[in-house]
From Swiss-Prot:
Name of the molecule in the record: Asparagine-rich protein
Keywords assigned by UniProt, alphabetized: Malaria
Basic and acidic residues composition bias: residue spans: 509-518
Biased composition (Acidic residues): 470-479
Low complexity compositional bias, start-end: 336-347, 399-469
Region (Disordered): 1-22, 187-254, 336-372, 399-479, 509-528
C-alpha cells in the first residue's frame, strides 16, 4: 500500500482513509519490540488520530470508555475520527522473522477467531496489509493463550454489506443482472406490442378481402413466432443470471440466494404469462378468425361433418385456459355449421399447420427446460394443474382440430377435382354436340345446294309430276322432303374432310409464302448493311 492508493472500491461503505495507517507502517523501524508480549510502545507524534490506542495491551472496551466518542451516533460514511486503529509488529520466536499482522477490514461480517502459533504467524481469511478494526467490534486480548478473540456485533452491520470481495461481486452481479433484466423488459414490451398488433388484426378480420385477411393472419403468426423467440431470450438471460449466482463464492449467501429465488419465480411468471398469451392468441386467431375468413363461405357437407367433431374436441378443453374462450368459440362454431360453402383455403391451412408444428416444438422445449440442478420436469413430478402440462394438452387438441380441418380440405380438394373432371367431360360432350350440329347445318346447306344444282335441268314434266304428287304427301313415309331428300351423313363427313384438307393445304401454302417473303426481306437488309459507310468525324 502507498499513499496514492486509498483502496477506494466505490462500495456503499464510503471512502476509507488509510493514510494514518500507512504513516504508522512507514515508521515501524522505530518500534523495537523484542517479542509479542513487550509493553514498550513508541508512538509517532505525527499520527494525528486521537482515537488510536497507545498501548498494544490495552483493552478495546476500556479504550472506548476512555475516549468519549459516541460511535452509534456518528456518521457511518466518515470514519476518519471514529475508527479504532492499531497495528502490531511482532517477532516470531522460532523463525526470528518479523511479521506484520492486523485484525481485518472494516465492516467485515465474517465470524472469525484468529490464533497465532509457531507455524502460522499471519491471519487467515483477511488481507495481509490492512490494519483496521471496525468500530462496532468488541474484544479482548488474552496474552496467556496467545490469541485474540473478537465477537461480531451484527446490529450495526447491514446485510447488504460484506467484505470487499463480496461487495465487488455483488456490484458486478447487480450490473449484469440489470442488463439482463432490461433486456427481458424489452422482450416483454415487444411481446405486448406483438399481441396488441394481433388483436388489431383480429378485430379487422372479415372487413377486408380474403387476400388482406390472409396477410394479417400471416403477420399474426410472425408476431407469435417472435414472442416465442423472445421467450427463449428471456430463458437465456435467466440462465446466465442463475449461473452467475451458482458460481459465486460469496459469504453473503442469504442475500444472493434470496434474489436468485426471486428471479426464478419471476422467470416462471414471465414464461407462464407469455405462453398463455401465445397459446390464446394462436388458438383464437387460427381457429376462429382464419376459419371465419376461409371457411365461412367455403364449407361443404364434409366440412360440416368435421366441424361437428371439432365441437366435441372443444368441449374437452380445460376451462382454465381462457375465461371468454368457450362461449366465443362455441357460438362461432355453431354459426359456421349453419353456413353453406364449398372449399377451404389449402395454402392458408398449410401455413397454419406450420405454426402448429412450431408450437409443438416449443412445448417440447419447455418440457425439457431446467432452471437449476433440481429441475422439475413436466413428465416427472409436476402437478397436473401445472401450466405446461395444460399447454401440451391444449396444443394436442388444437392439432387434432386442425388435422380434421386439413382432412376436410383434402376431401374438398378431391371433390373439387372430381367436379372438374365431370365438368371437363360435360364440356367435351357439349363441344361434340356443337360440332355435330354445325356439321348438320353444313350438310343441309351442301345437300340443298346440290339439290338446287341438280334441279336446274328440270323440265315441265317434272313440275307436272310434282304437282300430281302433292295430293299424296300426307302418306309419304319419308316425310315432307321425300325419299330423294334424305340426308346421308357418311357422304357429308367425307365431303367435310375433303374441304378441311383443302383449307389446311391453302393455309400451309400461305404460311410458306409469308415465310419466304420474310426471309427475302431479311436477306435484303443484310445485303444493304454491307454498303453502310462507317461514321467519321
Amino acid at each position: 500500500y502507498n499513499n496514492n492508493n486509498k483502496n477506494n472500491n466505490n462500495n456503499d461503505d464510503g471512502n476509507i482513509n488509510y493514510q494514518n495507517t500507512n504513516e504508522f507502517k512507514d515508521n515501524k523501524k522505530n518500534m523495537n519490540f523484542k517479542n509479542q508480549y513487550n509493553n514498550n510502545y513508541k508512538f509517532d507524534e505525527n499520527m494525528n488520530n486521537s482515537n488510536t490506542m497507545h498501548s498494544r495491551n490495552s483493552n478495546v472496551e476500556e479504550h472506548l470508555r476512555n475516549n468519549s466518542i459516541d460511535m452509534n451516533n456518528s456518521n457511518i460514511n466518515n470514519y476518519t475520527n471514529q475508527q479504532t486503529r492499531f497495528s502490531s509488529f511482532m517477532e516470531n520466536e522460532n523463525e526470528n522473522e518479523n511479521k506484520n499482522y492486523h485484525t481485518g477490514g472494516m465492516n467485515n461480517n465474517i465470524h472469525f477467531k484468529n490464533k497465532y502459533d509457531n507455524n502460522n504467524s499471519s491471519m487467515k481469511n483477511t488481507d495481509n496489509n490492512k490494519t483496521d478494526t471496525s468500530y462496532n467490534m468488541k474484544g479482548t486480548i488474552n496474552n496467556d493463550n496467545n490469541n485474540m478473540d473478537y465477537l461480531r456485533n451484527i446490529n450495526n452491520i447491514n446485510e447488504y454489506k460484506g467484505s470487499a470481495k463480496n461487495k465487488f461481486y455483488t456490484n458486478y452481479m447487480n450490473k449484469n443482472n440489470l442488463k439482463f433484466t432490461q433486456n427481458n423488459n424489452d422482450n416483454m414490451n415487444i411481446n405486448e406490442d406483438n399481441n396488441n398488433n394481433n388483436n388489431n388484426n383480429n378485430n379487422n378480420n372479415g372487413v377486408f378481402s380474403n387476400y388482406q385477411n390472409n396477410n394479417m393472419n400471416r403477420n399474426n403468426s410472425i408476431n407469435i413466432k417472435r414472442n416465442l423467440n423472445n421467450n427463449n431470450n428471456i430463458n437465456n438471460n435467466m440462465n446466465k443470471m442463475g449461473s452467475q449466482d451458482k458460481n459465486q463464492n460469496s459469504n453473503n449467501n442469504f442475500y444472493m440466494n434470496y434474489n436468485y429465488q426471486n428471479r426464478k419465480n419471476s422467470m416462471n411468471n414471465n414464461m407462464n404469462n407469455n405462453m398463455n398469451n401465445n397459446m390464446n392468441h394462436n388458438m383464437n386467431n387460427n381457429m376462429n378468425h382464419n376459419m371465419n375468413n376461409n371457411m365461412n363461405h367455403n364449407m361443404n357437407n364434409n366440412m360440416n361433418h368435421n366441424m361437428n367433431n371439432n365441437m366435441n374436441n372443444i368441449n374437452s378443453l380445460d376451462s382454465d385456459m381462457s375465461p371468454n374462450y368457450h362461449a366465443h368459440v362455441k357460438m362461432s362454431m355453431m354459426n359456421y355449421n349453419n353456413n353453406e360453402s364449398n372449399t377451404a383455403n389449402p395454402n392458408q391451412m398449410n401455413f397454419e399447420q406450420t405454426n402448429n408444428d412450431n408450437m409443438k416444438r416449443e412445448n417440447n422445449n419447455m418440457n425439457n427446460y431446467g432452471y437449476d440442478d433440481n429441475t422439475v420436469h413436466v413428465n416427472n413430478n409436476t402437478p397436473s394443474t401445472d401450466f405446461f402440462s395444460r399447454a401440451v394438452g391444449y396444443n394436442n387438441n388444437y392439432l387434432n382440430n386442425n388435422n380434421n380441418m386439413n382432412s376436410a380440405v383434402n376431401n374438398n380438394s378431391s371433390n373439387g377435382n372430381n367436379m372438374k373432371n365431370e365438368n371437363s367431360e360435360n364440356k367435351n360432350v357439349a363441344d361434340n354436340n356443337d360440332s355435330l350440329n354445325n356439321n348438320k347445318n353444313n350438310n343441309n346447306n351442301i345437300n340443298m345446294n346440290e339439290s338446287i344444282n341438280n334441279n336446274n335441268t328440270l323440265n315441265n314434266n317434272n313440275e307436272y309430276n310434282n304437282q300430281n304428287n302433292n295430293e299424296d304427301e300426307d302418306d309419304d313415309d319419308w316425310g315432307e322432303l321425300g325419299e330423294d331428300k334424305y340426308i346421308d351423313i357418311n357422304s357429308i363427313m367425307k365431303k367435310k374432310n375433303v374441304i378441311l384438307n383443302q383449307l389446311e393445304a391453302d393455309l400451309n401454302d400461305l404460311s410458306k409464302k409469308g415465310n419466304d417473303g420474310k426471309n427475302k426481306k431479311k436477306n435484303k437488309m443484310k445485303k444493304d448493311d454491307l454498303f453502310v459507310l462507317p461514321h467519321t468525324n
